[in-house]
Swiss-Prot record:
Ligase in keyword set: yes
Enzyme class: ligase
Gene name linked to the record: murT
Similarity annotation: Belongs to the MurCDEF family. MurT subfamily.
SUPFAM superfamilies with a match to the protein in the record: MurD-like peptide ligases, catalytic domain
Residues that hold Zn(2+) according to the record: C205, C208, C227, C230
Molecular-function annotations in GO: acid-amino acid ligase activity; ATP binding; carbon-nitrogen ligase activity on lipid II; zinc ion binding
Top-level taxonomic group: Bacteria
GO biological-process terms attached to the record: cell wall organization; peptidoglycan biosynthetic process; regulation of cell shape
Protein name: Lipid II isoglutaminyl synthase (glutamine-hydrolyzing) subunit MurT
Length: 447
């Protein structure tokens, strides 16, 4: 180990020691270490078997579920649970790692799509997992094919790594990479081929550019797609979900390759994350019993259907950041069998995406079919989200708006409903959690 690496380790770990006692610093120690040695990540990661999880939606939950399973196998798994998924956050994760008690060093990391190529200059994953790619933060990522090419460029740097893809996404059909490829997906009963919803993106045939149809469409552009023009269809699946046993707003049960599993988290979109976690675990040699044990011990993920109480109100915090994710979150809360208040917190910082026009493509119209006595529109762009909610036809007099998140919290505390959902963009979620943590309603970190 050379001098600059040694200094980087010392500076990074010292800053982590100080910041952790102040309750801060998920990325700063890595930033400090990288200033001493820009290649320090290569030294830190060289003795690890690494699984990388990337994609638009579902990175954090897929990673958390996978870690829960692999802890049943290895006892200790390195990960970045708070979602610090750019190079400074990844460097911090390795800087603060504890020595493995089993002698097997394994890391499961969620990595930002735009940061992946740079990070792969320094790490050698054995497995890449891509959950999906949807339109997200257009000012940062551009359109979906730009994002996909960013990821493929990173994967090509590690040609020996296996790539695990969501086979239900037409975008992932026959990727131009030298790596071994495996697919996971929903293999449910098929019906007559039909067009996807008119507002769905990414439904052009990857071979002839015709419009795809679906024999089964789970949501957005995902499902058993087929092109009636050239015969192109979804590839054979290596990991198959064959039955939905139960689906509610806070849990689900399903069958994957003959084994029934369950997670204590709601929504169809999150079952894809569980399916990806099962596929990763099986790829790494875990059996179904260990997978079940891991799922049974899984708990709330940072800001992703995280539950807590404000006074006597049971509250659930849900991250939203793009049209598909927001629509699926709305589909999930629609399954609630009780009335609830709704808060929608919209920020427009860099990490949220500065362009907030995506809210007009999310299906907020569904709220008019739900038992929602009142809505709080909050965050920096509270007036924009309030306008979007009024356009749905929901009564304008039942919508309050404020940029003050303390006021949102106070409103929830004083409401008549015993249940509340808070849908929040990324930085709004962080700010709201910070407020909750300051009142000891939630833990600041979820390690």
């Amino acid at each position: 180990m050379n001098l600059k690496t040694t200094l980087g380790l010392l500076a990074g770990r010292s800053s982590h020691f100080v910041l952790s006692r102040l309750g801060r610093g998920s990325t700063l120690p890595g930033k400090v270490a990288l200033q001493f040695d820009k290649d320090i990540l290569q030294s830190l990661a060289k003795n690890y078997e690494i699984v990388v999880v990337t994609g638009t939606n579902g990175k954090t939950l897929t990673t958390a579920l996978t870690v829960g399973i692999l802890k049943e196998v290895y006892g200790q798994v390195l990960t970045n649970p708070s979602g610090a998924n750019m190079i400074t956050g990844i460097a911090t994760t390795f800087l603060t790692a504890k020595s493995s008690k089993t002698g097997k060093n394994i890391a499961v990391l969620e990595i930002d799509e735009a940061s992946l190529s740079r990070i792969c200059d320094y790490i050698q994953p054995s497995l890449f997992v891509i959950t999906n790619i949807f339109r997200d933060q257009m000012d940062r990522f551009g359109e979906i094919y730009t994002t996909y090419n960013m990821i493929l460029d990173a994967i090509r740097k590690v040609p020996t790594a296996t790539v695990l893809l969501n086979g239900d996404s037409p975008l992932f059909y026959k990727p131009t990479i030298p790596n071994p490829i495996e697919y996971f997906g929903f293999d449910l009963e098929k019906g007559p081929a039909q067009l996807a919803h008119y507002n769905t993106e990414g439904i052009l045939c990857p071979d002839c550019q015709g419009i795809l149809k679906y024999e089964h469409n789970t949501y957005a552009n995902l499902g058993a797609y087929i092109c009636e023009g050239c015969g192109c269809k979804r590839p054979d699946l290596d990991y198959r979900l064959t039955k939905l046993v139960e689906l509610t707003n806070n849990r689900s049960r399903f069958v994957i390759d003959g084994q029934e599993y369950g997670i204590q988290i709601g929504g169809l979109y999150n079952i894809y994350n569980a399916l990806a976690a099962v596929a990763i675990a099986r790829f790494l040699g875990a059996d179904s019993q260990l997978i079940k044990q891991g799922f049974d011990k899984s708990r709330a993920v940072f800001g992703r259907q995280e539950t807590f109480h404000i006074g006597d109100k049971e509250c659930t915090l849900v991250l939203i950041k793009n049209p598909v994710g927001a629509t699926q979150a709305i589909e999930m809360i629609k399954l609630a069998p009780y009335p609830f208040s709704l808060s929608v917190l919209l920020n427009a910082n860099y990490a949220d995406g500065i362009d907030t026009s995506w809210i007009w493509d999310a299906d907020f119209e569904q709220i008019t079919d739900m038992d929602i006595p009142e809505i709080n529109a909050g965050g920096v762009r509270h007036s924009e989200i309030a306008r979007r909610l009024r356009v749905t036809g929901y009564p304008a007099e039942k919508i309050t708006e404020t940029s003050n998140l303390e006021q949102v919290l106070k409103t929830i505390e004083n409401q008549d409903c015993k249940h509340a959902y808070i849908l929040a963009t990324y930085t709004a979620m962080l700010e709201f959690r910070e407020l909750l943590a300051s009142r000891q309603i939630v833990r600041k970190e979820m390690n």
